[in-house]
């Protein structure tokens, strides 16, 4: 018997709330969860392990406990004005949008809207790009993404011949 405890109200963790629907439609996750349920896996939502249920109880009730808790704490930056209104962490922004989309097709307004806003996203990679795409879908007035990278060369390197794309500028979205 396998039991999965999920902190959120839906199964899937980062796949459910951290990756926008434009990249991963949630019916795919639901289908996988249904297959696991058919195989006997039990899912319990709304349980924050360590807070709602203690390790001692889990060790008493189960033969093995596997921690797959995911990253919950965002990486903050220390800069003057960081605590100003309108600054959000990426995962909070993405999660709120996805939850509102799944709950009400964004009609409940329980998300951080970028509609009509000039948005700057500090950070890159998949998470930064997911924020860019989500802001565009919200109808942001403009979206700028800043990412710390090594300085791009001014000219094409000898080991980067035509017809390959020149490696002089990076744009992810």
State where each predicted segment sits.
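Residues forming the flavin
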Residues: 1-173
């Amino acid at each position: 018997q396998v039991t999965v405890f999920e902190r959120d109200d839906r199964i899937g963790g980062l796949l459910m709330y951290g990756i926008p629907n434009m990249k991963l439609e949630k019916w795919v996750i639901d289908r996988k969860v249904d297959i696991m349920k058919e195989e006997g896996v039990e899912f319990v939502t709304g349980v924050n392990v360590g807070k709602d249920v203690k390790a001692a109880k889990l060790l008493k009730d189960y033969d093995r406990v596997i921690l797959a808790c995911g990253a919950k704490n965002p990486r903050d930056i220390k800069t003057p004005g960081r605590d100003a209104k309108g600054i959000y962490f990426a995962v909070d922004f993405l999660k709120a949008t996805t939850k509102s989309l799944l709950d009400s097709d964004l009609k409940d307004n329980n998300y951080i809207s970028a509609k009509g806003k000039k948005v700057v996203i500090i950070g890159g990679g998949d998470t930064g790009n997911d924020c860019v795409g989500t802001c565009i879908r919200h109808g942001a007035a403009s979206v700028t993404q800043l990412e710390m990278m090594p300085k791009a060369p001014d000219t094409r390197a000898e080991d980067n011949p035509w017809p390959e794309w020149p490696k002089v500028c990076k744009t992810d979205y």
